[in-house]
Structures are given as structure tokens and as C-alpha cells.
């Protein structure tokens, strides 16, 4: 074997080794409008994290223990979910596998959306909508009570670049990324996509109950 061939084999071997040893990709999530996050979640609550600890949560297919972080919480209000208050929230132990870090001590309030696990428990990931309560707009806070639920039959389509279009009347085009280069823009903060009497969907501004007929954008 010539020197060039040996060099090539060595380079390929090093490349393969680097690939095998490369850390897992970080958690990746598609942006969603707050209304979508509300509609997709089993549970949506306002809460504080009181304490946290690492707990075992069964075993993987190889018999290795699965670790999760358990947050004991104080629920302030439930906007969507079971009749029983949520007492514990579970998440993965690292952000690389979509684990969520909450401030503990009971001082910081959060809006937390996630999946129900039953018996006063829920599970959250970085792909769920979890934000400090005081960062929400007044419209967002009010929409949690009724407005977002009214739009769960509508579809919000994110526009990543111009041109973009809706493909059916029950869609609303989410333009924040194009207009503001920010997914937490004006439509996310102040608008909800609501079904109209003719079955189509349109953006509605504000949190007061809409008229039976309303335009695509209506001031409160």
C-alpha cells in the first residue's frame, strides 16, 4: 500500500472517529405562536417552582436508569387541564435533550404549558411554551382565559420569508419573523387567530369578545 493510500485511510478513520464521538445535537424546536402552544398543550398553568431534585423515571431499552428533574410547584391558576391541581413538573436533566430550567424558591412566576402525566403531574420540554409571567402582554394574559381556546380549530402558519400564502380559509398567516425578525413580535403579543361565522379564520386584536362578524384585524 502506497503512502498516499495509507494517509487517506488514516484521514477517513479519524473522520469516522470524530463523527462517533461528536456530542448529540442540541434540542431543536419549531417556533409556535402562543395560541398554538396553548392549543397543543394538555395543561396550561400559572405557577412558581418551589424546589427541584433529580429522580429516577424507569429504565431505557438497555436497562439504564432514566433520570429526570422533578420540580415541586405552587399552582396559582390553571387555564387548561385536569380538575386536580398540578403539584409536580418533570423535565429532562439537560437542555441538550430539551430539559427546562426553572428558578426555584417560589419567587418567580411562570406561564407553563406542557403534557399531562396524571395524578397532579405534567411533563415539559424546551419545545413547550414556558415563559416568565411578567414578560407576557396584557392581551396574552387575558387571551389565556378564553380567546386562545376559541381559535383552536384554526391553523396558524408561520411565514419564514416572502412570498408566503395560506392554503385554506381556516389559516392565519403569522408574519412576525418577516416583519420584525422576532417570533415574539406584534402578532404573538397582541393577536389571536379566531374562527368567524362563515368558517374562515382571521386575526383578531384584543381580548374582549368579538362581534359575530369582524374584520381580519380589529382594534380593541
Curated annotation (Swiss-Prot):
Disulfide bonds join 27-98, 29-127, 39-152, 154-201, 159-164, 172-193. Residues 27-30, 95-96 are annotated as: Involved in metalloproteinase-binding. Keywords: Disulfide bond, Metal-binding, Metalloenzyme inhibitor, Metalloprotease inhibitor, Protease inhibitor, Secreted, Signal, Zinc. GO terms for biological process: negative regulation of membrane protein ectodomain proteolysis; negative regulation of metallopeptidase activity; response to cytokine; response to hormone. Induction: Down-regulated by TGFB1. InterPro entries: Netrin_domain (IPR001134), TIMP (IPR001820), TIMP-like_OB-fold (IPR008993), TIMP_C (IPR027465), TIMP_CS (IPR030490). Zn(2+) binds at residue 27. PROSITE patterns: NTR, TIMP. One of its GO terms (molecular function) is molecular function inhibitor activity. Residues 27-152 form the NTR domain. The record marks 40, 61, 67 as: Involved in metalloproteinase-binding. Residues 1-26 form the signal peptide. It holds the Pfam family TIMP. Its main location: secreted. One of its GO terms (cellular component) is extracellular space. It comes from the Eukaryota. It is found in: Secreted. The activity of TIMP2 is dependent on the presence of disulfide bonds. SMART domains: NTR. Complexes with metalloproteinases (such as collagenases) and irreversibly inactivates them by binding to their catalytic zinc cofactor. Known to act on MMP-1, MMP-2, MMP-3, MMP-7, MMP-8, MMP-9, MMP-10, MMP-13, MMP-14, MMP-15, MMP-16 and MMP-19. Interacts (via the C-terminal) with MMP2 (via the C-terminal PEX domain); the interaction inhibits the MMP2 activity. Belongs to the protease inhibitor I35 (TIMP) family. This is Metalloproteinase inhibitor 2. It comes from Homo sapiens. The gene is TIMP2.
